[in-house]
């Protein structure tokens, strides 16, 4: 194509003219300016080709052809642009000194302003061109530029006007970051070289080849400014330009120096990592090379220590030097100089005897590894193409998708980068097997794949989950299995033909089989390491063998290339052919339907639904196996994508993980909603919400505007609230970038308070999901509440407030707790809540006239935030009020009735829930509400901080009876009177709990009467009567007299005039009489009830005599009364407030019944129906109605409640839930092995202490003549049954000393080597506590001894052998034991018999019958626990005499003689005891818990609020199935073992108040759900908070003539499915708690009485045994007592009637109890439930009750 002449461009403002350019023609279909990424390589090739063909032409003869124009252009036309770069950035052909460069002609024309401030240069436009100069011969880079090969016609061409240059030059990229500057400089230098300016670039010495001209300096300056913006330059570059902004050359020089320095460091590191030395070069030269590299790196700031340097050097040693790896591998502190001394020694020895073998000892494994056999005679080249990491025990293997099937032969160009620490077997070609074997030995006669990298071998793959093979000749029991889907790493399907077994016959003559899949679509046969591990085979890449767990070598591993291989010669061939398998697969697959076809046929349902339907036969004709599911995973249906398109969902877990580390109320989310339009000015238009990240507790505040001051006021309020109420400080607040949050006022406020604002990205609402979702939820609730209630829209924020209160109290499905529970607050008291918009009548305390109505209709909105009242909207006044003076308007149609739920109303429900809050409050008539619970196991059971401490201002007002009143409550003769709404107390009415919210519409007024077997522990019938049983009309009059009889003590002292009652009309049970009942206050009621004693054997009311209530039988003699008072006098029972006896008025006996069905309300769902109901007595109007509160879930009518579900009883789990594939859990190991304590212990000081303990143990074993040192036995000569493995274990004792113990592996000891009938006994903890208690009461001295190496004093009868200690180095020898070595099954029993015999024969002691390891004589008592002895004696010399006798035979050490009269501290079997003789004894574990609990990795909260109780009542353990993987399950079970193990140890030692929680959680160790773990953490947190608590004993009164042994019993009745009752007992000796027990009942109890009988039956045997022990140790008379709060149990024990024993289990137990009580002089007495300290053993209690029952004996 001919050249075309282009016109000059229009001049620029400086009047420069455009120079004419020349070039060879450019192909028309290629744009020379196109430098996009897709054409970069093509442009470079074209540039190189053009340069090679370039010739010089006259300036006037040729111009470059522009492919975008077909004809010559006018002067105004411009050259085309390419992407973001203007045309001047693309270097075109130019003259050496162009005439059009007058603007850049002289440096003086460059603006001299600071570069970083305002360069003010004139960037060249399309009219100006950059100069291009011939490249010089030298370049600053180590390698020439790929485009620097430009040549010129001759040297004289430089003098001509035109210069031969490149046709076009690609510009450098724009600099976008200071960190990218080093890489950008490289591209910029390349750009200069391609622009023929290579000569001006500084060389290695910092000087350019030639001087730069002014035009070149201008070009350099402008291009640098264009492509390197000042804001992206590094600091050091800006510093240079600040001095001289044109000094670009200095920047280039500095950059080249940095690149050279970095290159040198990289080269040194690579050289050091790839050191190779075999003695071929002098050792001096090798040492000099290595030390120079290390010194150079250290000087450059890269520190190489001796350990790393030695490892790198030893890794490169080969030949005769290779053994240095093994001889010095244990020397941890070896230096480089020491290593080179060994290298020099070997090198000199080689030089001295070059042709002889070296005389130093070589490692046998080295000789084996160095022997090679090559099939060719040429010298092989060892190539390690895949570098292995140092000290990596598991070598890298390849995945199937990484293996290429082409060009698999090793390349000679690959560099040897590094080798593993133990050099693996490497093959250099297919014939080099490296094991001395021929090729024919490792190949298989069957089909081989000739293109394999290593034929006849299987590739070991650690990433493959299945084994795959291409040949069918090794597949056994093959069958088609189309359901298996196999994908590679790119998620591509691998078709599977068949599945079968792959059988190995290893070199130890064992056969092993694994599953294998057949497919021809893989490059190599893959052997999965995971499937090998499943059959107990592991790959050891340090030895390069396959081995079993016991160390048996099965086959060698070959390393070839990058991968590891195993020979196929170990595979057993089969008779199956490839066509057989392929035909089977083909015949199966031909009948399959493609999944897209089925998907379309079944209405585009998803694959999971279709597959599940086919599996369950909901679709017939074809089965699941008839569908080809291979494409179901990746199949994307275009129609589904269009038709089912949805918005992007919120990303789960998108919040940053560090937020989880914040404590409660430290990280808040906030957002503002609004505005809401068309509202009155008084109504808020916005609200601002806050959510705590940890607890998810929410706050909302109304706003009228979004001004800075308004937002600041809210922030000030909530920060102060959190600080004062929760003692927390807010650290971070996350919010969006709205102006209300980004203003300067709020920013300064947050900065002043030390709060970090965390802003989300603009317009990214998903990043603010917590606050956004809360606003959406609250608005949904708001719309629903307004729609349901029909209230006006301006009350919208009240609906938001109501929703917030409720939402904070609802449990989250994820955390299983509510926000209030997370925040440590009590649950929401539903009795204080009304439906939103409930019609009420509000009392007008200030009417306009005395004759005006006092009631104003209103609608309840939400509980008040600032008082105990309610926020109520008054439409007539158009305002809201905060008041407690309201009553629910019944029978009034509300908005709820518009839905016509079969005309259902909720009046009775509201009465029952809010009976005590419906009333008007008259002036000065406010009374405190105190719920009572008399003679019940259920004291305060539901009072879980639900009641505030302040009194409630509540009274009731009369309303008209509703249509829902049961007709059975009226007869034709009855009068139309109003009824009193008596609210059922929370403590006894389970139907007010979460398990039953709403009652049945139909009610029955007939009381339910049951037999005595189903009564509560207080002896009351299950009539659920508050105080007394209901009486028939016939004996009503007689009951009046009974109320004034001896049923109530001191009845005459309390007159009716002192009560100030308000008479309330009530209806009798029969509905025929209406009587007036004086209204009684709560305190007065309690005073009257407390002394009332109903009869234990009382029959049902219809069979009663005239006196309906009969007191319990009292002692008939003064001595028995004294015994009862004596037993109870010294017990640490809680102090109750003094109460005055009270007489009940006659009409009060006719209160209607309250039907109570007790539910479980404990940690694990344990409940207790052993409770009386109580009455909340309030002042009421004379016109109040009486409404029976009786709820039965069985009578729920679903037709009457279409929109509300019936209440469901929540299931509680008290059984261990099934977990799939659960294997046995190994016990937790608390000791260290030899390698952990010594070999690899990095703590030098601790290691030295363990070494010292090791030698001490060995010396002690030799001293004690533990084994026969005269003869060592060969292992092969001894029966394996009699050989016991041995090991060293190390641990750190409580006193800080380090201990080593050489033990035998008794856990694998054969049963024939010991007598299974022998037992190892230790002192029972009850015996120790009894001895300590008697020691305190009798001023005994307590001496603590320790016998060193106790077991070694006992001889062994059996013939047993063990392995010698490792330091002897006799691995193949055995030694015969002579002593009872530690760890043997019989050692404990042998020692017990030895020390028992010595104490009896030599010390004159005798063992207490029934109490092993408790010895006594006339002066001394000894408690023996293995090698620990505790001596008790009134005379210290008696203890010293025993010590002297013991030292004659045993190495006895006195730990504490106990001779001081001041306080003495002991550490006895883990108990930290403080004992001052004759005064007190304190038992605790503060120091031990302070040390151990932090090591449990429990998230303790030392700075937060301390827990006041170990658990919360009302929490239930969910029964949902636990689905977690095996590793996580084992990890959590091990964690539970540690936590519950420590808690059990502490609980059974002295913290008996924790036993219930420990026992409940111990039942769930194998069910470690999140909820169980949280409860366990809470228990450990409570132990941490109360670690300083102690069991306090005080000396008994010296005047007491008898020892008093008492058992206090209690039980909680488990009346739910999957649940049993809980029983508990506490034992006291002379008023001191010595033991406790809490456990699940072994038998299913059908009533509370049975549970109580079970508890008593468990206590009596231990009580009798303790009685015998006390009598043996102290000769005083003993009084035995048993206390229970179940009157029915006492009645059964004392009664002679046997007719009511209906089942054989508890009937037998009851009869046995009668015999034991009568035959053992056991006193059984009743104790009030409020004083029953055993209550803590059977149920979780509220904080107040828990403290009341425990603060007397543990504090």
Curated annotation (Swiss-Prot):
Reactions listed under catalytic activity: DNA(n) + a 2'-deoxyribonucleoside 5'-triphosphate = DNA(n+1) + diphosphate; Endonucleolytic cleavage to 5'-phosphomonoester
Known EC number: 3.4.23.-, 2.7.7.49, 2.7.7.7, 3.1.26.4
Entry keyword Iron: no
Integrase catalytic domain location: 660-835
Post-translational modification: Initially, virus-like particles (VLPs) are composed of the structural unprocessed proteins Gag and Gag-Pol, and also contain the host initiator methionine tRNA (tRNA(i)-Met) which serves as a primer for minus-strand DNA synthesis, and a dimer of genomic Ty RNA. Processing of the polyproteins occurs within the particle and proceeds by an ordered pathway, called maturation. First, the protease (PR) is released by autocatalytic cleavage of the Gag-Pol polyprotein yielding capsid protein p45 and a Pol-p154 precursor protein.
Subcellular location: Cytoplasm; Nucleus
PANTHER family, per database record: TRANSPOSASE, PUTATIVE-RELATED, TRANSPOSON TY4-P GAG-POL POLYPROTEIN
Role: Capsid protein (CA) is the structural component of the virus-like particle (VLP), forming the shell that encapsulates the retrotransposons dimeric RNA genome. The particles are assembled from trimer-clustered units and there are holes in the capsid shells that allow for the diffusion of macromolecules. CA also has nucleocapsid-like chaperone activity, promoting primer tRNA(i)-Met annealing to the multipartite primer-binding site (PBS), dimerization of Ty1 RNA and initiation of reverse transcription. The aspartyl protease (PR) mediates the proteolytic cleavages of the Gag and Gag-Pol polyproteins after assembly of the VLP.
Stated name of the protein: Transposon Ty1-PR1 Gag-Pol polyprotein
Organism: Saccharomyces cerevisiae (strain ATCC 204508 / S288c)
Record lineage: Eukaryota, Fungi, Dikarya, Ascomycota, Saccharomycotina
Gene: TY1B-PR1
